[in-house]
Regions:
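Short glycine-aspartate micro-motif
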Residues: 83-85, 111, 187-191, 213
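Acidic-glycine-rich active-site phosphate/pyrophosphate-binding loop
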Residues: 91-107, 190, 205-215, 333
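Short, conserved micro-motifs enriched in small and acidic residues
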Residues: 111-124, 231-234
Length: 351
């Protein structure tokens, strides 16, 4: 694998330059124009590797599909079931102006800046890997042509599709169907999110996420003149939150977080309305469904208050599977070939 290391080293500086430009181009979620500009810049970089770009319009900003050939004559525009999908996103959580306060910089071998890891670094890394593979493929083809090697399927010759969405940080509402369609048509999906911990462990399991809003409708009243005629919506949700706090189970990895509560108008008025925002996570679809069933069955403690629940599943869990275990084993084998120890981890963060 000395050839691979040499190919990576040959293009590392170019990949870092792309990475820097992409980080300096701010792309907060919802800034459609900024996301479209970055999408075209990223597409141009991959077009230099003979990928073809397609832009799928969406309210959040265009999603970018980049299609590469398979090395055996398949056209890029064809449906290539069984290929590999590299999945990423263009948007970041940072508001516009962050780059001025936290500019791109390199210090002690580390790089800093808004979105430098999540996930413009992942996109740059994909570009570098594919550029290195292109060198290896060209070297293999030259060896065959000169008779110094026998014909073989060149490294990385599987059909590769890259999907970069514009709304991941806000829940992927507009890109979900597209992502699922491309993923189902693929042999494997590699997500370009940062690895786990300092060693960059591969994330082979993720918790699923469900988001809910509990709304309480009570009755307003003057706190000094007619207190007992009122029905306190905030108190109702405080009681509900206290109950939900007992649903988390550390041993099973189930968490139910009451993260935001809003309500009331002023201190001397019994609040008639309030809402509670709940984030629920679990390792399995079964546990997440059980939480949703329980939340939807909640009833108001105060009979004078009306309680409603909205929301539901945001991201399904990525449970460890036999197929995923096999894919990770392939990654470990590839790592050993170049002297890299690859480990796995599970994370509660969604993607």
């Amino acid at each position: 694998m000395d050839g691979l290391k040499a190919a990576v080293a040959a293009h590392e500086a170019e990949a870092i330059a792309l990475w820097r430009r992409w980080v300096q181009r701010e792309t907060p979620s919802g800034d459609r124009r900024a996301l479209e500009i970055l999408g075209h810049a990223v597409a141009a970089a991959f077009e230099s590797l003979a990928f073809e770009a397609e832009f799928v319009a969406d309210g959040a900003g265009a999603h970018v599909i980049l299609r590469g050939g398979d090395g055996q004559g398949t056209k890029r525009g064809q449906n290539r079931a069984g290929g590999w999908l590299l999945l990423g996103h263009l948007d970041t959580v940072y508001p516009r102006g962050t780059a001025a306060q936290m500019p791109w910089r390199e210090q002690d071998g580390r790089f800093y800046g808004p979105g430098v890891m999540d996930m413009k670094g992942g996109i740059a890394l994909a570009w570098l890997a594919l550029r290195a593979m292109q060198d290896l493929n060209q070297a293999a083809s030259t060896a065959v042509a000169t008779g110094s090697s026998s014909p073989r399927h060149p490294p990385g010759a599987a059909a590769i599709t890259i999907l970069l969405v514009s709304d991941e940080e806000t829940g992927s509402a507009g890109s979900r169907a597209l992502t699922e369609k491309l993923a189902r048509a693929s042999e494997a999906v590699l997500v370009l999110e940062p690895g786990g911990g300092e060693s960059g462990k591969l994330k082979t399991a993720r918790k699923g996420i469900a988001n809910f809003v509990l709304r309480a409708e009570g009755k307003a009243a003057h706190a000094g003149v007619d207190f007992f005629a009122g029905a306190n919506a905030i108190i109702e949700l405080a009681r509900q939150a206290a109950g939900l706090a007992g649903w988390s189970q550390e041993a099973r990895g189930i968490t139910v977080n009451c993260g935001v509560i809003r309500g009331g108008t002023r201190g001397n008025v019994v609040p008639a309305e309030a809402e509670l925002v709940v984030d629920a996570r679990a390792w399995t679809a079964r546990d997440l469904q059980a939480i949703e069933t329980r939340i939807r069955a909640l009833e108001a403690v105060d009979p004078k208050v009306r309680l409603t629940v909205s929301g539901g599943l945001n991201r399904p869990p990525m449970e460890r599977s036999a197929e995923g275990t096999k894919l990770f084993a392939r990654a470990q084998e590839a790592g050993r070939a170049v002297g890299v120890v690859i480990e796995e981890c599970a994370t509660g963060g969604g993607s």
